[in-house]
Amino acid sequence: MAAYDSLMVFTGNANPELAQRVVRHLDISLGNASVSKFSDGEVAVELLENVRGRDVFILQPTCAPTNDNLMEILTMADALKRASAGRITTAIPYFGYARQDRRPRSVRVPISAKLVANMLYSAGIDRVLTVDLHADQIQGFFDIPVDNIYATPILLNDIKQQRIENLTVVSPDIGGVVRARAVAKSLNADLAIIDKRRPKANVAEVMNIIGDIQGRTCLIVDDMIDTANTLCKAAVALKERGAERVLAYASHAVFSGEAVSRIASSEIDQVVVTDTIPLSEAAKNCDRIRQVTIAGLLAETVRRISNEESVSYLFNEEVMTGSMLLP
């Protein structure tokens, strides 16, 4: 990709490695800024170069530590706004707080996803770019444009390179059926669904498998892996019902708590995730966990937004496996 006079990309401390990969694809340098903390823990931001009139992107996931990383975005956006940046887009590969998107049974809880959307708007951000939002309808919480892109092209390319035989794509729950069905269609593979239900109170949850998995390689697809507890239980259920191998592909490697050790001792043969969230050392050293990069996809999306080109074009079937999306 060629360099652009107006485009600038800044990052905080959440995932600088991904930001460096993105700017290499764009053939530009990463914006020069100091993002640190004062002695009392408050976020300290200083822009170290001119941004007046520029088209600026802040690339930062709001993974753990979620609040610190979110505050870095907000303070950096405020600094850019006060320095007269022409347009401010925040690229949030992993959008934290997305699971708090409703009030189930009208319980007294916040809708934190909406609160974060309001905070980003109030900070002076003009546009938001995300990857695989936990729920697509969160885009409606924003009063500014949102481009929610999908890691599917990257994951599909990786799956196809593995040349897996007897493949069945598995949705880990009813809510993930649309995603799993789309992947199965792209791979010309069978589809299975895990139906989790608790027969009655104080009775262990039962996992029913809808679909034929006997002797098959089962590929579980999901948007994120958090504690990996449900994923590991699903792998046990699939193996008990005759699955030959169990693989898992997910966009976001949240890996909270004992997730990595759970995966290492589970029935899962391999977990493949993208680099929207950086891996811990434990995850990097786990031979069952492998990471692929979405830097090429993010860079092309940034380029298209900056040039006022179509983003949805990237997800047409004809171009979903295009070389411009590869690392």
Swiss-Prot record:
Mg(2+) 1 binds at H134. It is found in: Cytoplasm. Keywords: ATP-binding, Cytoplasm, Kinase, Magnesium, Metal-binding, Nucleotide biosynthesis, Nucleotide-binding, Transferase. The active site is at K196. Mg(2+) 2 binds at D173. Pathway: Metabolic intermediate biosynthesis; 5-phospho-alpha-D-ribose 1-diphosphate biosynthesis; 5-phospho-alpha-D-ribose 1-diphosphate from D-ribose 5-phosphate (route I): step 1/1. HAMAP family: RibP_PPkinase_B. Present in outer membrane vesicle formulations which are used as vaccines in human. This is Ribose-phosphate pyrophosphokinase. The lineage of its organism: Bacteria, Pseudomonadati, Pseudomonadota, Betaproteobacteria, Neisseriales. The gene is prs.
